[in-house]
Structures are given as structure tokens and as C-alpha cells.
């Protein structure tokens, strides 16, 4: 079966939401396409003196509610359509969380494992130079994504500020604390995933503390979500990364697994596991809660028939294909969509941006409290829409909320020119 095109998946999700909204078809069509996409070729000198070229993208999908917002990823699988889709999901992620941003996304086609730190710095600074006319504190605010982090964000900030001869810490988020970052940012996506899991179990009149949990993907989002969900009393019985999965029916020590992965580079071989499994086996385990926290399209239509979890909370972006989503809906599996569950990252990025503009630092407790309030309010808005509009699932309900907010902003601004 061919892999689903993520941009087409986004458009299908918007069409699904449109069936429950009184929105002009032309306006909805406008919301299905990016306003602009930058595609550029970076020519960068390698350590050995040779020149290598890299294809890079930045999609600015929609800015009706505020500056474009979204991460930059480094991955050999980056495509133009993927970047467009991810930038679109950011529009609706910021809207469902009701924070004043639009959506953007960027990426470079490369495997960072194949390059030295100095080469990655030159690649990053070359991309930042190309982005310079398009980004800014009130224009487009990038952030980390797959295979990028504080280091890369610091390089982009420094490049922008040097070229612009200014101080603009809010031009980028996800920075190190000493470079204007925010407390709580590193754990934010995993924390919002935990809040979403807690809220959906409460909504279903179930207790998260009694749940068994499997987490696919043990990077930042997955490992933090696993740790915080375990702190709620749940038994995290299986986790995985690209090397495979480890399982213990009595529960894994999530912190010990993270320490083992940090030391060895993978979860495979963790001595606290009773068996090792494939990623596919983890996705079809008999558990109460499944948390996909890896890349897009982890669960397709065929695999969805074998998913044995009662609840799926999407820590990753687009881990279900639309057909898989339909299968899980038909089977009665409750799915909390990515645009709400993993919105912690962009929400705390917003907090970082606010702190940068105020030149004032919040405490971690304040960050976490504000994040919890936004995620719980967003969850309530989603479930209200689900019940009031009669949507088939929570994903469509989340898009109903988000699309309506974007449409209201667009129509309220009038036409120009």
C-alpha cells in the first residue's frame, strides 16, 4: 500500500470538518493551501573543503490569526508536501489552543548523523540567511522539530540578529535558557500529551492511574509523556524507538529506560524488559492507551484493524492516515488528535515569545500551570463541539473548533485589496 500523502491527509481532515460548519466553500478552499512556500538550495562548504548542496523549504500556510509559527526539521525524508502539511496542521493546532499564531513549517533534506557539528552549524546558518527576509518576531517565528533543538535555534537567532544588526530574541523559540529560552519548553510536548491523556480518560469516566500504556517513539516527546503518564499511576508496559520495542507486563521504569537510551543510543537491550518486540507489535498490543510519538503515518488502514488499544493519544504529528482514522472511529477507539495532544510545544513556544517581548522570565511552575489551563480549555472546547455538532470523532471536532476560529479571524479582517 503506498504511503499516504500528508498534505492530502490534511485536506481530507479539513473537508471532514467543513461538513459540520456553515462556512463558504471558497473560504474553506483557501484554508486548504499555503499562502507561500520558500524552496531554496543551500550550497555549504564541508570540513574537507568540498561543496555540498541541500534542498530546504519553509511553508507559511496561514497568518490570519498571527505570525506564522512552526518548527524546522532535519531529515532525509523531508518533502515539499510534508512541509506544507505540517505547516497547515500548525495553523489548526494554534487555533484549537487559541493562541495568537498562524502556521508555518520548515525542513532541510539531510541526515544529521552524516555531518559534523561544524558542518551542521554552517548548514543551519546558510538556511537562516535564506530565511532572513521571511522571518521576524511579528512575521514568522520558527522553532525546533525533528533532529533540531536548542543548539540550532541559537544559531538561527545569532545569524538573524547579526545580519539585522538588532536584538530580537523572539525571532525563534525553543532556545536555550541563557539565550532567551523558557522554563518548561523541553518537556512541553510530552506534558501536553499527559494532560490530554488525563482529560480523555476523565471524559470517558475512566481513571488514567489504572491504565496500561504503550508508547511508540522514545525521543523527547515520547519519553517525557511516558514519564509523566507513569507519574499519574499508569503502567507503561512497552516503549520503542527506531531500534525496536521493549516490553514488561508489570511496567517499565520510564526514567531508567530514558537513561539507558541516553547511554546506549537505543531502548533495545534494556535489562528491565522481559521481551523485545517490533514497532508494529507494540502498536497492536492489548493496552488501554497507545501513544504514537514517532513520525507521520505510523498506523495505516491495514494496521488500524489490529490496533488493540481503547484510547490513542497522538504525541506525534499525523501518526494516523485518514483511512486508519476512519477504521478506528468505526471500531470505537477514541483518538485524541495531534493538533490538541501535542500542542504543548507550540503553546510554551508562545509563552517563550511573550517572555522575550516582555523581557521578563516566568517560573517553570507558572509555565506548567498556564499550559495545563490552555490544554484543558482546548479539550473542553473540542468535546463540546463533538457533542453539539455530532461529529464522528474528536479529531473532526477539534478541526471544527480550529477552522471556525481561523474563518472568524479572516472574515473579521475584511477583504484586501
From Swiss-Prot:
Which GO terms of type biological process are on file? Answer: glutamate catabolic process
Task: Note the SMART domains from the entry.
Answer: ELFV_dehydrog
Catalysis: reaction(s): L-glutamate + NADP(+) + H2O = 2-oxoglutarate + NH4(+) + NADPH + H(+)
Instruction: Look up keyword NADP and say if it applies.
Output: yes
What more does the entry say?
Strain NRC-36014 contains 4 distinct glutamate dehydrogenases while strain NRC-1 contains only 3.
Q: What is its EC number?
A: 1.4.1.4
Protein name (database record)? NADP-specific glutamate dehydrogenase A1
Organism in which the protein naturally occurs: Halobacterium salinarum (Halobacterium halobium)
Amino acid at each position: 500500500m503506498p504511503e499516504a500523502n500528508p498534505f492530502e491527509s490534511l485536506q481530507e481532515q479539513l473537508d471532514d470538518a467543513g461538513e459540520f460548519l456553515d462556512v463558504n466553500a471558497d473560504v474553506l478552499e483557501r484554508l486548504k493551501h499555503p499562502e507561500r512556500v520558500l524552496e531554496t538550495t543551500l550550497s555549504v562548504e564541508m570540513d574537507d573543503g568540498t561543496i555540498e548542496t541541500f534542498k530546504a523549504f519553509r511553508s507559511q500556510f496561514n497568518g490570519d490569526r498571527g505570525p506564522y509559527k512552526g518548527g524546522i526539521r532535519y531529515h532525509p525524508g523531508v518533502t515539499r508536501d510534508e512541509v506544507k502539511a505540517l505547516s497547515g496542521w500548525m495553523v489548526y493546532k494554534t487555533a484549537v489552543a487559541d493562541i495568537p499564531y498562524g502556521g508555518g513549517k520548515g525542513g532541510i533534506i539531510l541526515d544529521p548523523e552524516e555531518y559534523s557539528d561544524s558542518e551542521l552549524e554552517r548548514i543551519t546558518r546558510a538556511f537562516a540567511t535564506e530565511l532572513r527576509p521571511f522571518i521576524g518576531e511579528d512575521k514568522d517565528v520558527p522553532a525546533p522539530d525533528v533532529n533540531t533543538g536548542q543548539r540550532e535555534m541559537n544559531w538561527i537567532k545569532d545569524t538573524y540578529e547579526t545580519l539585522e544588526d538588532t536584538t530580537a530574541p523572539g525571532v525563534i523559540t525553543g532556545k536555550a535558557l541563557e539565550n532567551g529560552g523558557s522554563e518548561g519548553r523541553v518537556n512541553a510536548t510530552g506534558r501536553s500529551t499527559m494532560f490530554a491523556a488525563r482529560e480523555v480518560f476523565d471524559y470517558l469516566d475512566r481513571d488514567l492511574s489504572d491504565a496500561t500504556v504503550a508508547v511508540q517513539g522514545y525521543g523527547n516527546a515520547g519519553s517525557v509523556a511516558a514519564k509523566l503518564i507513569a507519574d499519574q499511576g499508569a503502567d507503561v508496559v512497552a516503549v520503542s524507538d527506531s531500534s525496536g520495542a521493549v516490553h514488561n507486563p508489570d511496567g517499565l521504569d520510564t526514567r531508567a529506560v530514558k537513561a539507558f537510551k541516553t547511554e546506549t543510543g537505543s531502548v533495545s537491550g534494556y535489562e528491565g524488559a522481559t521481551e523485545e518486540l517490533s514497532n508494529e507489535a507494540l502498536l497492536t498490543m492489548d493496552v488501554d492507551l497507545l501513544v504514537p510519538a514517532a513520525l507521520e503515518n505510523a498506523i495505516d488502514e491495514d494496521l488500524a484493524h489490529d490496533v488493540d488499544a481503547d484510547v490513542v493519544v497522538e504525541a506525534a504529528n499525523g501518526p494516523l492516515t485518514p483511512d486508519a482514522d476512519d477504521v478506528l472511529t468505526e471500531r470505537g477507539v477514541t483518538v485524541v488528535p495531534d493538533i490538541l495532544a501535542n500542542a504543548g510545544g507550540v503553546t510554551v513556544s508562545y509563552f517563550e515569545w511573550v517572555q522575550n517581548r516582555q523581557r521578563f522570565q516566568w517560573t517553570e511552575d507558572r509555565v506548567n500551570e498556564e499550559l495545563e489551563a490552555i490544554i484543558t480549555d482546548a479539550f473542553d472546547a473540542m468535546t463540546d463541539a463533538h457533542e453539539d455538532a455530532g461529529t464522528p470523532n474528536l479529531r473532526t471536532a477539534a478541526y471544527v473548533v480550529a477552522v471556525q476560529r481561523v474563518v472568524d479571524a479572516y472574515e473579521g479582517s475584511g477583504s484586501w485589496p
